[in-house]
Amino acid sequence: GMKMHVATDDIIGIVTNAVYGPANEHDISRARELIPSETEQVYGDAGYVGMGKREEFQTDKEAEKRSYRINLRPGVLKGRSAEDLIRKIEHFKSSVRCKVEHVFARVKLQMSYRKTRYRGIAKNAHRINTMLALCNLFTFDCYLKRLMA
């Protein structure tokens, strides 16, 4: 199997970086390759908890300027009410992070990419890179249409 890790722009939602790896690898192990050193804000799901404490992120010269906004695990929010401040903060983080999920939805639903076709990550990565480039064109076109309306 194969996993795709994607970094997107937080305003438009276009893909800025994509990293591929085996499916049995943890999400946080590919985070250093995914996030450039000049990034100021990092949003991620619960699989990236503790990313800011890892050694490879603390050695950057921009590390003190970077803020990590990682969603909590679902079990932490289980007993809280809907009006709770922590739940509202998590909702805001998720609303920014959903731009990545839109990329995955576009690749899977519009471009019908559900299974890896080739043997090896490199061949599948070339195919997905082409799909992500098309996805960026679609996303930017939608963004321009929203601006013009």
Where are the predicted features?
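Short, residue-level hotspots on alpha-helical faces of the histone-fold
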Residues: H102, R106, M131-N136
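Helix-centered, glycine/charged polyanion-binding patches within enzymatic domains
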Residues: E40-Q41, A46-A122, H126
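Polybasic low-complexity intrinsically disordered regions
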Residues: G1-T59, N129-C135, Y143
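Intrinsically disordered, low-complexity and often Lys/Arg-enriched segments
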Residues: K145-A149
